[in-house]
Amino acid sequence: MTRCAPFSILLLAANLVSAQALVVLPGTDDPNALHFNERFIARNHVASIVGQQLIKRDNRPMQEQKEKYLYRFDEQGRTIYSNNSFGQPGSGRDTASVIYTYNDQGQVTRRLRNDLAGHFAYTIERDSAGRTVRETYTRIENLGTDRYTLVPGATTEISDEHYTYTTVNDTTWRKRYLNNLNLPYREQTFVSDRRGYLLHIEDRYVITERRSRTTFSYDQNGRLAERVEQPDMDRPRKLRNLWHYDAAGNVISGELWHDERQVNQLEYLYEESSMLLKARLTKDMETGQINVVRYHTTLR
């Protein structure tokens, strides 16, 4: 007979998950990219977050940089707009902005990117399980005179990727990449344990047989603690990311190692009363330079 956990414990667990401003996820994405917790953003009525870049060099005062980051969220806590800019927004020096569109299941179906090269759209088609089966990358002509306001004109297709999925067994599945001849050229194999934790991803290019492998380890609370990437399995070089958390589950520090050499050290700071993200610090272990992004949150 299986005993149900007391409601108070379930409620505490749910609150701890919601209390985390950031989540660290296993997968193929950039491990150091910010992933905002949608439940936290929605519950705390966060409308936007602005980040200001600063640099601290040895024996020199902190210097504010022109680079800024902007994230906007809908009422469900989803990121609907992001921007990375130099100087004031609208000055013409913005490096990139992205508008996100979601389906009824809360999954991204389109990313509209605007940078100095123009407007580009990533359109994603999904199957009934929510998996990406097609991703089309197009350039959209802007008939308007304002770079930031798209008046759609001609569309030029740049790439059209298709994917298929195969279930190998209860804990293993495979993703295949198809080229324009509908032939597989790459495959990724995902292996989890029986509890659902992703253990490793093996990436193989069919023609060259080049393989890479990424493994994941977790702490006693099921949070991602280590990510080890071997970009080429014929060579011993490895990239290792480590993460540490506080009692509430907030990520508070991270490390990046290239083999036995530590490359950088990350720290995350939060507001004590609200647990809103306050700053992220990245120290280059070779030069000693510290890059700081200081965050300001606007509520609805």
Predicted regions, residues:
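Bacterial N-terminal signal peptides that target proteins for export
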Residues: M1-F7
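N-terminal signal peptide c-region/cleavage motif recognized by signal peptidases
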Residues: A14-S18
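Buried hydrophobic residues that stabilize the cores of well-folded domains
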Residues: Q20-R300
